[in-house]
């Protein structure tokens, strides 16, 4: 019943999940979408489909700028959708143009601490930006660069180490109504 009310209040507005890699956007997103009866899109998966290769290969063969161009293109298409939960890449906030797309929906920042992200990303060989000697230093630098940009989100959701993804989705659903403007009836206009 509460979910029906939230769906009605959202009126099909997209939810964009932002945050650092390892924050759980691709894990929480489908759970949130399912509870809302929304579609789920993982922007990184779509970028790979458009490019016809893995993100690591895009970085290696074409460079980060090409990846960011593809990311912006895919985000533009996703922003035109409705009733969708969209997990974005961690660096989506770096381009001003991307914010114009993100503002087509409700932007939710899954905020993980450096310690949490380190624990989740240790040994991850799939993420090109993390293929460095000192993972903690790299993550710390990326976090410092991106936190002020993530802070522009409509909602900041601080993550805890042992939080269940389903519980996170539930807490987000409980928080969303407070972010939405009350609907005016025709009689009030």
From Swiss-Prot:
Residues given in the record as substrate binding sites: 44, 68, 90, 146
Binding sites annotated in the UniProt record for ATP: 22-27, 127
Compartmental location: Cytoplasm
Listed cofactors: Mg(2+)
Keywords, comma-separated and alphabetical: Amino-acid biosynthesis, Aromatic amino acid biosynthesis, ATP-binding, Cytoplasm, Kinase, Magnesium, Metal-binding, Nucleotide-binding, Transferase
A Pfam family of this chain: SKI
EC number: 2.7.1.71
SUPFAM superfamilies named among the record's database cross-references: P-loop containing nucleoside triphosphate hydrolases
UniProt catalytic activity: shikimate + ATP = 3-phosphoshikimate + ADP + H(+)
Enzyme class: transferase
Signal peptide stretch: none
Annotated family: Belongs to the shikimate kinase family.
UniProt cross-references to PANTHER family, sorted A to Z: SHIKIMATE KINASE, SHIKIMATE KINASE 1, CHLOROPLASTIC
Protein name: Shikimate kinase
Gene that this sequence comes from: aroK
């Amino acid at each position: 019943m509460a979910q029906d009310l939230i769906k009605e209040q959202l009126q099909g507005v997209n939810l964009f999940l932002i945050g650092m890699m390892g924050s759980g956007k691709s894990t929480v997103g489908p759970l949130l979408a399912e509870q809302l009866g929304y579609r789920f899109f993982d922007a990184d998966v779509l970028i790979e489909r458009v490019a016809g290769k893995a993100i690591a290969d895009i970085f290696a063969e074409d460079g980060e700028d090409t990846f960011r161009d593809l990311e912006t293109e895919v985000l533009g298409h996703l922003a035109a959708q409705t009733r969708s939960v969209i997990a974005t890449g961690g660096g989506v906030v770096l381009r001003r143009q991307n914010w114009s797309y993100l503002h087509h929906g409700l932007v939710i920042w899954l905020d993980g601490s450096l310690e949490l992200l380190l624990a989740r990303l240790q040994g991850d060989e799939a993420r090109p930006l993390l293929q460095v000697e000192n993972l903690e230093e790299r993550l710390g630098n990326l976090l410092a660069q991106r936190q002020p940009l993530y802070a522009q989100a409509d909602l900041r959701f601080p993550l805890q180490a042992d939080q269940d993804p389903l519980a996170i989705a539930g807490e987000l659903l409980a928080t969303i109504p407070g972010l939405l403007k009350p609907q005016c009836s025709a009689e009030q206009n």
